[in-house]
Amino acid sequence: MKLKKLVWLTALALSTGAMAQSAPLTIPHPTTFDQLNKPAAEVRMPQAYVKAIAQQAYIWGYPMVNQFNRRATITQAPEPALNGGMVPVAPMGQLSMLTDYIKPAETFVTCPNQDVVYGLGFFELDKEPVVIQVPDFGDRFWVYAIYDARTDQIANLGKPYGSKPGFYLLVGPTWQGETPKGIEGVIRSSTEMANVIPRVQMDDTQADRVAVQAPVREVMTYPLSKFDGKMKSY
């Protein structure tokens, strides 16, 4: 009896050890809507539960809807310009810069900074990567806020991060190309949609309004196919 019990325990230990060393169990996940398990027809969800799910879906999805709607509208501009003389607009893959502080009458940005020159551009990174041009701002504060479709910031590019002047490559989530010589760094977006909002500090003086124009004219983005290693300017 003892021998049988010992054999049984040994076999159990061996089988348990083999299971522990084997690959972890993977559960297949649906990849299409039709593969999802659906509730039975007689199941009725409480109204409070349905409202809670709807609220969560709205909060989760609204940033993306907002981003895509803005991109579809703003990129209709035939060239970099200012809509209503206030809001930067530009074709897909390019950006437009202000040359002064943002005007109080604008409503596109809810809480804008009051001491920077703004810019704005939208991209389709599944079509082609985009070169982001960073001029030498000297001691001036600057930052390029870059966002994906979820409005998550996807890069640390600016004076607070010790970024160097030069060229940076913004690519989509599936891009596998070669990085050209002369590119300081590669920024990968988690979505094909991305946008950039440069901010360049400017003193509220006539002298600095004149001085900031030179670097602002070199704040540009353009498709990788147009990159030649030379700093461009408007």
Where are these regions (language model features)?
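Gram-negative bacterial Sec-dependent N-terminal signal peptides
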Residues: 1-22
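A compositional/structural signature for long, glycine/proline-rich flexible linkers
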Residues: 21-234
